[in-house]
Amino acid sequence: MAWSTPSARTTGDLITAAIWNQDVVDNSQFLHDRVRELWIPWVTYYGSGLSEGNVGDWRSVAVVNNSINHIVWFSFCVPSDFASLAGLHLLVAASTSTTYEYDVNTDYGASGETYNVHSGQAVNQTVALTANQYALLDLSGLVGSLSAGDFVGLNLSNSNGANAGTLHVLGLRLRYNRT
């Protein structure tokens, strides 16, 4: 069937236009709801016995789990399109099955604020790890006041407990809803 007003069109053209208007143009308002992810590798580490290592093809910090003086640091800036936090997770893998005991500290703030205007701390945390399997440690509760443009410093350290094997620290995954 051909249409002649306002210009000549075929039924296929009208159906395509209707689908475009309904499913693409009208739904563009929801694009801001998409969750974005940012991968943050470790920056540096401190402690005797710590070294750079590998887990498969991943570069890692190999943390010998029997010393409380082992620290791995992360630093990053929160993206400008950040609207709200969907999750902050540390990706690790253990060389042996163990219960890992750890502490996490964080300080963050924006330009013009003190470096520790927002702080978070979790001490004597534990997580059961299975040998050679990825594990995500949820750190979301430590950055509850996170905002676009904030500069974040975060460190992971062994707590007082005895841990077996080696923990490979791979990186942080920041998940957020964008503006």
What are these regions (language model features)?
Residues 38-49:
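N-terminal targeting leaders for non-cytosolic proteins
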Residues 64-85:
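Short beta-strands within extracellular/lumenal beta-sheet-rich domains
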Residues 91-93, 105-109, 175-177:
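Predominantly extracellular/luminal cell-surface or secreted proteins
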Residues 1-36, 50-57, 73-77, 101, ...:
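Extracellular "spike/adhesin" assembly and maturation modules
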